[in-house]
Amino acid sequence: MGRSRGNFQNFEDPTQRTRKKKNAANVENFESTSLVPGAEGGGKYNCDYCQKDITGKIRIKCAVCPDFDLCIECMSVGAEITPHKCDHPYRVMGNLTFPLICPDWSADDEMLLLEGLEIYGLGNWAEVAEHVGTKSKEQCLEHYRNIYLNSPFFPLPDMSHVAGKNRKELQAMAKGRIDDKKAEQNMKEEYPFSPPKVKVEDTQKESFVDRSFGGKKPVSTSVNNSLVELSNYNQKREEFDPEYDNDAEQLLAEMEFKENDTPEEHELKLRVLRIYSKRLDERKRRKEFIIERNLLYPNPFEKDLSQEEKVQCRRLDVFMRFHSKEEHDELLRNVVSEYRMVKRLKDLKEAQVAGCRSTAEAERYLGRKRKRENEEGMNRGKESGQFGQIAGEMGSRPPVQASSSYVNDLDLIGFTESQLLSESEKRLCSEVKLVPPVYLQMQQVMSHEIFKGNVTKKSDAYSLFKIDPTKVDRVYDMLVKKGIAQL
């Protein structure tokens, strides 16, 4: 596939494997980048046999003899000069600096990309980028995905829109690049103080993040960092560890295209590549969905919600894939608003059953109820904390039965009407779970109906209240004890 093994007869020159390095002073670096003959700083090449100027032209470089070049004509007749022999392995040094498919990717870059993928395999984009030498890891990945994987002629690129130019246009482009380099060099000589250095990886990363996900991440806090750590998300690499469908690469681990493959085997391997491409697309879709919806960080909308309201929001997470971000946020607001209204209606109905006749009374009742629940929760916490300390003493002491007054008053704390009840009535309210205001209201209504003659037995009082008939029976029995009702 690559030029590094084209005509080498099992010989591999390590200096030619990755020849585009960051050191621009390397002569090998310029062998494929010099387009204009005699360009300044590019160096000239002469045929070592006929001494013809072959700068900027296709030439033959011997892989055994150091710094030995031949023109096409001398190579075709088998010219030899000691110590060079005509049977030495050689390399064709072409001029591939023109754009082929993309304006910012030369044909030389395309060949180095495919050669790097053949050597290091899919997924090792850092090594592939090092092999190309002029592109970053993100640029190599994006270019391979857009040009090769998403090509309608997969696995081949779409060659119907090749950015071809004639020789004059290519020379003009190269001359323009050389003029730009000269201008930059002059600027550096005039202004020796260089601007502040910016880490190239950071700038590339920021541009890649903005391009892929459409925005920067929110400012991280300690809570946010803990959520990111729990999700095993590496912010700097923008990867999960492990990734979704982490075993997808195992399909290609041992697969290799060979020259002796049958058409059926070749088609089968291409089908495996298509399946692998789809699995990568699904992995990318899920990752972009998580980043776009900001699922790695707490939702600001849920910051002021109660625990019950957060539970309601979590139940709707399964519908997030069917909505846009704005639609899902609107759904959460509507559901939370509905939950609050339903809860408010239940509280008001409970207050109404308790005998409240105004909003102020209902608020006082609900406030006392919440206060009582908080006190009971604190008491349970204290009792559980002290249980370990008094466990030994409990084993040595005889069991003490709690007083009936304490048990009866336990559920009646906070009701001023409880002062109007006797001990037996308090016990009745505790057993049947009736609050004092409701009990007094039932007693008043039943007494009024008994005096009018509408209630002569227990079953007659069932229609007066929309509660459990057993509670009505207990209240009626209490009126019988007081002599108001008759059996």
Swiss-Prot record:
Acetylated in vitro by GCN5, but acetylation is not essential for biological activity. Expressed in roots, leaves, stems, flowers and siliques, with the strongest activity in the meristematic zones. GO terms for molecular function: DNA binding; transcription coactivator activity; zinc ion binding. Zn(2+) 2 binds at C62, C65, H84, H88. Zn(2+) 1 binds at C47, C50, C71, C74. GO terms for cellular component: nucleus. Pfam families: Myb_DNA-binding (PF00249), TADA2A-like_3rd (PF22941), ZZ_ADA2 (PF25299). One of its GO terms (biological process) is regulation of cell population proliferation. The modification N6-acetyllysine is found at K216. Residues 401-487 form the SWIRM domain. Residues 100-152 form the SANT domain. Disulfide bonds: none annotated. Residues 1-13 have a biased composition (Polar residues). Keywords: Acetylation, DNA-binding, Metal-binding, Nucleus, Stress response, Transcription, Transcription regulation, Zinc, Zinc-finger. Signal peptide: none annotated. Residues 1-25, 368-388 are annotated as: Disordered. A zinc finger (ZZ-type) spans 42-98. Disruption phenotype: Plants have pleiotropic effects on plant growth and development, including dwarf size, aberrant root development, and short petals and stamens in flowers. ADA2a cannot rescue any of the mutant phenotypes. InterPro entries: ADA2-like_ZZ, Ada2/TADA2, Homeodomain-like_sf, Myb_dom, SANT/Myb, SANT_dom, SWIRM, TADA2A_B-like_dom. Residues 368-383 have a biased composition (Basic and acidic residues). It is found in: Nucleus. SMART domains: SANT, ZnF_ZZ. The middle domain of ADA2b is sufficient for interaction with the HAT catalytic domain of GCN5. Required for the function of some acidic activation domains, which activate transcription from a distant site. The exact mechanism of action is not yet known. ADA2 stimulates the acetyltransferase activity of GCN5 on free histones or nucleosomes, probably by opening up the promoter region. Mediates auxin and cytokinin signals in the control of cell proliferation and might be involved in repression of a freezing tolerance pathway at warm temperature. Involved in the positive regulation of salt-induced gene expression by maintaining locus-specific acetylation of histones H4 and H3. Interacts in vitro with the HAT domain of GCN5 and with the DNA-binding domain of the transcriptional activator DREB1B/CBF1. Interacts with BZIP11. This is Transcriptional adapter ADA2b.
